[in-house]
């Protein structure tokens, strides 16, 4: 049996075809979405959990070496890896919030798969993380289906996050493919996420149109100009319908990070001075919220940065504020900070102003964020997104008849306004912002696996 599988940066979802229509399956708490989060007692627990409780093979030398190190480490630390040691989605977030110092937590593993300079053991670790999530998702889907799931069309961005170009894309897709096969999928095919979103929209068209798909996901923005319509449905070879593509490593997570940096970090002393009037360095505050940047997070949570923060507290004109950043370092609160910014971004899609409260850092710590503040904070990443729209059109040398906007950030009035200003007079359509890619992947799975 086949599925469409959106292994997303922000959320994961699965769809099957029933009576000619895609149907998303339940993943967690009666929702069709599983937030892309995972927690465990230690990083090493994930590898042992796969082997000990799910008989997932360690196929090559690097994954075997990782497994041996993991088992040895967990034994030395007296950590008993049980069937429930690894949690996913909101369950993992709840455990992390309850005890951030004792829980190893990761959000959006997909963000790191195309990172440059990953060592073989780091690639093996990310493969295990992805495999664990895919295994869990496959099990959730399997419980709702009568036949064994063996085939999947998995979505991928035009360009994964990372600076390595084609090499980064090959690295990331390789991790996804190996992880999927270790998780039990025998046949795996990849499809570009904006193309998949377009396929779902195509099902509503009565005539051929040039459709500009703008898919703003958690980690990437992907744009495709596609010829779509009844005559293209069910055609395995659609090369002639693909007019232009572009993609950049800017997505919803980057919007959340930018909002946290500009609007929340000043509460923690960013922009302050020493007693001598010298500006404090900005980098520690940026690294604290750059949750999709492995080197930045490693640097922030290093012992050397802990010593630097001690020095900054000692020298700052407002040491009590910088001490709050020190608390973020000590209690590993980066994800909670960015999560607070995300909640404000979502709220500002329907209200003019919202209050950001950070009681997990300090009881009274709060600030108001307005639509104007949001627009100012997001100006740079938004400009990058609009560049990709223009690049896709330049590659195609054609104008769209309609814009199909999808992805988790598609609901933002700010983004719709910017697109309308860039392409005046062209209608903007939307669908299921969180499910259109998954539905399109299921439609494509029906074409390739039927």
Language-model features: where?
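N-terminal phosphate-binding loop and flanking beta/alpha elements of the actin-like ATPase fold
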Residues: 1-34, 70-213, 229-248, 365-366, ...
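Phosphate-binding glycine-rich/basic clefts of nucleotide- and phosphate-handling proteins
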Residues: 35-40, 64-65, 228-360
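Extended N-terminal export/anchoring regions of large proteins
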Residues: 20, 29-76
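Conserved Rossmann-like nucleotide-cofactor binding loop
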Residues: 10, 219-221
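Short, well-ordered loop/turn and helix-capping segments at boundaries between secondary-structure elements
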Residues: 261-270, 421, 425-428, 443-450
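Intrinsically disordered or highly flexible coil/loop and linker segments, enriched in small
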Residues: 118-119, 146-147, 269-273, 343-354, ...
């Amino acid at each position: 049996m086949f599925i469409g599988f959106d292994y997303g940066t922000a959320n994961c979802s699965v769809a099957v075809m029933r009576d000619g229509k895609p149907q998303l399956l339940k993943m967690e708490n009666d929702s069709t979405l599983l937030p892309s989060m995972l927690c465990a007692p230690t990083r090493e627990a994930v590898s042992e959990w796969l082997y000990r409780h799910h008989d997932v093979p360690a196929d090559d030398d690097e994954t075997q070496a990782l497994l041996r190190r993991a088992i040895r480490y967990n034994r030395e630390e007296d950590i008993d890896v049980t069937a429930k040691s690894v949690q996913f989605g909101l369950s993992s977030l709840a455990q992390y919030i309850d005890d951030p110092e004792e829980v190893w937590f990761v959000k959006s593993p997909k963000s790191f798969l195309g990172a440059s300079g990953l060592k073989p053991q780091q690639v093996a670790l990310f493969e295990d993380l992805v495999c664990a999530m895919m295994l869990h998702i496959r099990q959730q889907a399997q419980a709702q289906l009568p036949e064994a799931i063996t085939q999947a069309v998995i979505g991928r961005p035009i360009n994964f996050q990372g600076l390595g170009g084609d090499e980064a894309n090959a690295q990331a897709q390789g991790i996804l493919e190996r992880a999927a096969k270790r998780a039990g999928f025998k046949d795996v095919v990849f499809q570009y996420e904006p193309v998949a979103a377009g396929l779902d929209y195509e099902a509503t068209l009565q005539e051929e149109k040039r459709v500009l798909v703008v898919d703003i996901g958690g980690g990437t923005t992907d744009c495709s100009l596609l010829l779509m319509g009844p005559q293209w449905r069910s055609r395995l070879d659609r090369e002639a319908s693909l007019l232009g593509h572009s993609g950049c490593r800017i997505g919803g997570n980057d919007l959340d990070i930018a909002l946290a940096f500009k609007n929340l970090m000043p509460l923690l002393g960013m922009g302050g001075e020493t007693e001598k009037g010298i500006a404090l360095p900005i980098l520690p505050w940026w690294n604290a919220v750059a949750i999709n940047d492995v080197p930045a997070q490693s640097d922030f949570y290093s012992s050397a940065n802990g010593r630097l923060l001690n020095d900054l507290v000692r020298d700052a004109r407002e040491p009590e504020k910088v001490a709050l950043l020190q608390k973020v370092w000590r209690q590993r609160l980066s994800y909670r900070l960015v999560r607070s910014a995300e909640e404000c971004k979502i709220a500002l899609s329907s209200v003019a102003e919202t209050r950001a409260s950070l009681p997990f850092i300090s009881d009274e710590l709060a600030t108001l964020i307005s639509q104007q503040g949001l627009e100012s904070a997001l100006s740079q990443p938004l400009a990058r997104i609009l560049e990709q729209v223009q690049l896709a059109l330049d590659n195609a040398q054609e104008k769209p008849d309609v814009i199909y906007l999808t992805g988790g950030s598609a609901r933002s009035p700010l983004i719709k306004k910017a697109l309308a200003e860039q392409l005046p007079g062209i209608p903007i359509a939307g669908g299921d912002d969180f499910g259109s890619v998954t539905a399109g992947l299921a439609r494509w799975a029906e074409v390739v696996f039927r």
